[in-house]
């Protein structure tokens, strides 16, 4: 699982699955519009691993290699947000109802009450469901860090999304959700994402590992910080120079030209979020 985590985004082009599919990209065609990026990362990771000098699995038997490869495929495919609901449902089904109550017993570690990965009676499917959940949760982990760290990740992700939006506009494609730098309200989107995805995901993790309760505390604190900004109507600070130029342009043609030029130049200045 550690190798899968290290390589789960290898070679990422900075463009989402939605873009790949809408653009009928080579990646989308290769992987039949199904978890395009995740399949691409897997292929690139295993091509890298099998090279001379980097083959960390070369001493394994063929049978053991197949087992590890199967596990890694499942884990990296689990980082596709399209399977988020399925992953949470799988984990929820393994947690006894009484553990979901706030007044449950304060054991130091409840993991063994759900499933013991060393128990021979635990099926391989159950074990893999846990590993998939762990890597999926870790992939969303920036929102469980303190606000300063989380904020930096939001800046980086927003920059990446908005560059994609610029490209979509230049290609006359539908602009993907959160990828329009002119209309995206970042505070509101963060409130929705943390409340709808992060906290429910990490609630299960904290049930299994109570010592990780700080992750939920950080997520709730981040949600409150973003909610405060949203309540204040703050979208300021998310206006790079290109957006300012577009706001001052009254011509649709001029706007399209600015978008296209910005993409072609691959302007990668990271958006700074000013919240003082």
What are these model-predicted stretches?
Residues 3-276:
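Divalent metal-dependent phosphate-bond-processing catalytic cores, especially two-metal-ion Mg2+/Mn2+ enzymes
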